Amino acid sequence: MDSPLCFLPQMASDKAIKTRQSILDAAKAIIIEEGIGALTMERAATKAGISKGACMYHFKSKRALQAALVEEYAAHLSSELARHEALFDGPPEETLVPGFIEWFRSFDHDNHGWSTVGLAIHSNFVHDEELMRPVRLWY
């Protein structure tokens, strides 16, 4: 999803893509371990094993990092629903509800901390229309 807050160059190298993902993974881990209030650019950079300048290259601001996390969360929601819908045969209108039910049954298992991150995103950014746009579009 393209967002004015989040930028990934069209021709990004594999190293740049991996570095960007390691920053997102570090930010997610900070939220899971310490809460969203502990997330700073410096903390994300340190946890990712890079300099703050390298972090700022990929995310120009904390808000840009937050926007990327929101986008990644929305992508996670889409992939999880699709994965659970695929367990059932039939057209989408027949697999959607059973897919949701199966997803909710397994919600506490193997979600890699996404429920904690999702809760933090919803509770902290609920009134931020621009930041929450990817999630609201998913719902």
Please state what every model-predicted region is.
Residues 22, 30-64, 68:
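Helix-turn-helix
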